[in-house]
Amino acid sequence: MDEKKLTIYFTSDLHGYIYPTDYRGQGEKELGLFKCASRFRKDGNTLVIDGGDILQGSPLGAFCHDTIGSAARFAEMMNRCGYDYVTLGNHDFNYGMPYLDSYLNVLKARCVCENVRWDEAGVRFPARIHTLENGLRVGIIGIVTDYVNIWEKPEHLAGIAITDPIPAVAAALERLRDQVDLTVGIYHGGFERDLATGRVLSYPFYHI
């Protein structure tokens, strides 16, 4: 079998930090969407994916919500960076579904989040199949922690249901099994530290 290559650039938890600044001091910092995107080298066998939590957490995020009332600017900046797929993070629901939709309606990337359903009916953001330039068929499945139901105000989840991610992803894997060569899972959830040892499992900044 001929070897086929897939390159993935992955970001997550940008929390509204688009420019390379922490808003605390002068000088460029090693953080933010544009700093990450400056390292992307994209071709027909490359996917650029984000794992969620883009809309909330920075002064810019607060300005877009409180003053502009729309998250479309974040989508426009993601579009410029060439994202192909995103999933949703728990903080993306903080301002309610209309605000989240103002982002998704402008976003060119496909949103995949298998356990977000239309009031427990159909999947709102189903898994996708992406065929690379080299012919490799890649399944893309996204899921978010269902703890959103505990953390978030019910009115912010109006019109949707966030279900257990495990059976949701299992069903998606079964559905895609005979149609793809490999599957990429994007999960927004988990723990920052090992609960037994306290060892840090994730870091706030990572050089791409």
Question: What name fits each language-model region?
Answer:
Residues M1-I208:
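Acidic, metal/ion-coordinating pockets
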